[in-house]
Amino acid sequence: MAFKIPQKSSVSIEDPESLFRDLRERTVEGLLAQQADMLRKYMNHVNKNKNTLDIALELPTGSGKTLVGLLIAEWCRRTKQERCVLLCPTKQLVHQVVEQAKEKYGINALDFSGPKNRYSEADKTAFNNCESIGVATYSALFNTKPFFSDVHTLIFDDAHAAENYVSSLWSLEVRRDQDETTFDAIWQIIAPYTTENDQLRYYDQGNEGSLDTSFVNKILTPYLLKCRTALTAAIDNASRDDESSEEYGYRWRWSMIKDHLHACHLYYTSNSILIRPLIAPTKSFLPFQKARQRIYMSATLGEGGDLERIFGRKKIERIPAPGGWDKQGIGRRLKFVDRKSVV
């Protein structure tokens, strides 16, 4: 008896809006006006600009952007047989999006939060075979050995707040309370280029003074270039220490930026020294670079090029928020007020 080889079905769904009406297990009646408007704008833009790789969608808080991202991902998966993943800043948001996708919208999204060695084989197979979309944290993509190394469509939720998550792959932080030896070695190199007040803070903390968290300063780039050779030698020495390298990740983090210090900034506080590039070099990161489409969902886009700087893109096409979105929202906002600011 011959084996029956399953054939991938060819699904013809005109657009993500039509897909929503086809979701039989959803518990919400219909799309909000601004959600439908954004999906139409997205499709119009894609149809007119087929070679556009980077698109930003302005979807303010409470406008229902999660469903928009899920529908685009599911539509690309079904109609183009693409591997699609929606990336969130935190694990809690991943869990929330997956729960909403399944219980409210009838979309089978897979939860890829946590370390990749804990992903189930069934989930990995379903994702790689384009049978389900994935939802994961930014760190699941931006690491040296990501599971998502061959994704067709990347959708970034809360892209305006993603800078630290994206740049973490190319950031080296040395904390005084974790590795005082390396911290002191670097401080002695940069100390001549710091202010007298900052040097006093350093010595006060060293003499068991109270931790001063009220300042963050930066070594001027010309001075950083002057001490680059000594700085490289000090961090090379720390990264050769097997114990420190394994515990704090010096080796692989340092290898990402060692030859590019001229493009980095060095920030310091009383307890931490951070070296990272101003612009994330994502063009050299293949899991990000070779995606067919990258969609950035942001509460605010602006015109200053900040989104391009965060993601290392030369140009990101923008689709502004539909008019009247604030008259029909689904989210609640939580505001924190610093007591010091109102005293």
Predicted regions and their residues:
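Conserved SAM-binding loop
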Residues: 31, 86-87, 134
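Conserved pre-motif I regulatory segment
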Residues: 2-58
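ATP-binding Walker
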Residues: 63
